[in-house]
From Swiss-Prot:
Organ and tissue specificity: Expressed by the venom duct.
Source organism superkingdom: Eukaryota
Protein name as catalogued: Conotoxin
Keyword presence, Disulfide bond: yes
Pfam annotation, one family: Toxin_11
Annotated family: Belongs to the conotoxin P superfamily.
Length: 27
């Protein structure tokens, strides 16, 4: 799943987005 913290999208997996400093699942 995508809920690690982030400052930018590159810190998240490719199927996630960085929003409000957390990685979130996106389709």
């Amino acid at each position: 799943s995508c809920n690690n913290s982030c400052q930018q999208h590159s810190q998240c997996a490719s199927h996630c987005v960085c929003l409000l400093n957390k990685c979130r699942t996106v389709n």
